[in-house]
Amino acid sequence: MGLSRVRAVFFDLDNTLIDTAGASRRGMLEVIKLLQSKYHYKEEAEIICDKVQVKLSKECFHPYSTCITDVRTSHWEEAIQETKGGADNRKLAEECYFLWKSTRLQHMILADDVKAMLTELRKEVRLLLLTNGDRQTQREKIEACACQSYFDAIVIGGEQKEEKPAPSIFYHCCDLLGVQPGDCVMVGDTLETDIQGGLNAGLKATVWINKSGRVPLTSSPMPHYMVSSVLELPALLQSIDCKVSMSV
């Protein structure tokens, strides 16, 4: 880490600032209710949702040649077919997908304490939102949680040539804010993208949000700092700046 004070903080979005996993679970529960009440599925409803969750976790597509709506509707169509058999049911798949999507967007909320933290931090440093993912999906999340006004810039991996952990997207963020990598801190919940990316780009520090308290594998990227909540960040940044002051 360099000897300059922190001038900018890059935040991940999903499961760092908003509870994407929790919102997705709520969406799945609504689909289960739909399948059980309207279509009289029993245990198959949960099996279908479990299959979709696996497909989402392994999702890989080219954003310039494939529509995320088509990809994710197909996840539901395949899961229904694999579970129930019979003819493909695109209409039911679409109903499930849009219910899941709309429900989870309703629950993607920027909590009041997070808003307050961002507001206070922005008085001292520049803030940038750096999120991987499909352009449409991430823009919808940003709109849903209404976080635009808390940041000086927003960068979405799906709109760039490379996503986290590629150094190039971090350098692009630095250019947008007029800062150097050694001035910046990356905050996120994913070691392989947020932390590894910050390390690759030579940022001043990386902060891992480890809500579950899990112990990282020895082969995993090692963050400079680890906290259980993003709300611990202001105190941590003060500590980092104090170390700089003592070193100068």
Swiss-Prot record:
It holds the Pfam family Hydrolase. Keywords: Carbohydrate metabolism, Hydrolase, Magnesium, Metal-binding. Inhibited by calcium. Inhibited by vanadate, sodium orthovanate and phosphonate. SUPFAM superfamilies: HAD-like. The keyword Oxidoreductase does not apply. Its cofactor is Mg(2+). The keyword Ubl conjugation does not apply. Gene3D superfamilies: HAD superfamily/HAD-like, Haloacid dehalogenase hydrolase-like domain. GO terms for molecular function: N-acylneuraminate-9-phosphatase activity. It is an enzyme of class 3 (hydrolase). It catalyses: N-acetylneuraminate 9-phosphate + H2O = N-acetylneuraminate + phosphate; N-glycoloylneuraminate 9-phosphate + H2O = N-glycoloylneuraminate + phosphate. InterPro entries: HAD-like_hydrolase, HAD-like_sf, HAD-SF_hydro_IA, HAD-SF_hydro_IA_CTE7, HAD_sf. Pathway: Amino-sugar metabolism; N-acetylneuraminate biosynthesis. Its EC number is 3.1.3.29. GO terms for cellular component: cytosol. Mg(2+) binds at D12, D14, D189. GO terms for biological process: CMP-N-acetylneuraminate biosynthetic process; glycosylation; N-acetylglucosamine biosynthetic process; N-acetylneuraminate biosynthetic process; N-acetylneuraminate metabolic process. Phosphate binds at L13, D14, T131, N132, K164. Signal peptide: none annotated. Belongs to the HAD-like hydrolase superfamily. NANP family. Catalyzes the dephosphorylation of N-acylneuraminate 9-phosphate (Neu5Ac-9-P) to sialic acid N-acetylneuraminic acid (Neu5Ac). May also use N-glycoloylneuraminate 9-phosphate as substrate. This is N-acylneuraminate-9-phosphatase. It comes from Mus musculus (Mouse).
